[in-house]
Amino acid sequence: SVPKNKIFKTLNSSGTSGKKKSKIFLDSNNARNQQLVLSKILKTIIGNKRLPMLIIDKNPKNIYKSEISAKLAAINGFSIFGREHSYLLNEKGEIDYLNLNIFLEKYGNTNFLIFGFTSTVYENLFSKINLKNLKNNFSNGILIHGGGWKKMESIKVSNAEYKKKLFNKVKLKNIYNYYGLVEQTGSIFIECQYCNDLTTSIFSEVIIRDKYLNVATSGQKGFIQVMSLLPSSYPGHSILTEDIGEIINKNSCVCSKYSTRFKIHGRLPESEIRGCSNI
């Protein structure tokens, strides 16, 4: 691990069970590599230019600390790929229509980036938003969202229904789900826009293991094991999660990505509900 005098940033684990959270210590080199790889992955969606960015959350500037939670780490990590940042929610957690309309009037007619956690986006852009208070829609938005699927499962909303509901409500059509752990920040698995499967990159891989921890066959559900080349200041190269998924065996997709494709089916029953949206 990294010497104490080389610690650049400390992250709290998003997946640790129990009262005492595991901590991930990053040196400057590891943090930089994570940012570079995340940039390469996101460029396939948003291009090379930073876009105006709407964050579906409260402004976290007053609660940033040296020890950053998974949620704040994700907001920080994605924010560097946007500009002219605006936050949907005020300090009370309510939709700030004044701020939202200023953003949409200025940037709504061109491509803009939206980031948020799955359930928070759904709660605010579908359940709570009042269209009568809007002066523009989200048709030019590019939404990247992750985490919070446990909450969506509890209200019986699938990934396909999620996309359909957001389009019908606010005309948001460019929607990308991602899967990732704070323990492997940068090595996210982004959803293919054509087949809607999650995909690996050249920096990461996924293995599915059965209940005996043997490698599962294609199409067989099991525990998700995530692997990344990025960790250099902490032992996070291979992590066996409590998430359940399966490898999707597809010979081809119009995106032409050569990668492992997989789906998430939720978390192991009775495991502790933890993740970015729960912190």
Describe the residue ranges of each PLM region.
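Active-site diphosphate/adenylate-binding microenvironment
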Residues: S1-N12, G18-I24, K40-I45, N62-Y64
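Short secondary-structure capping/junction motifs at helix and strand boundaries
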Residues: K20-F25, K43-L54, F81-L88
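"Short basic amphipathic alpha-helical interaction patches in structured regions
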Residues: K9, K23-R32, I68-K71, I129
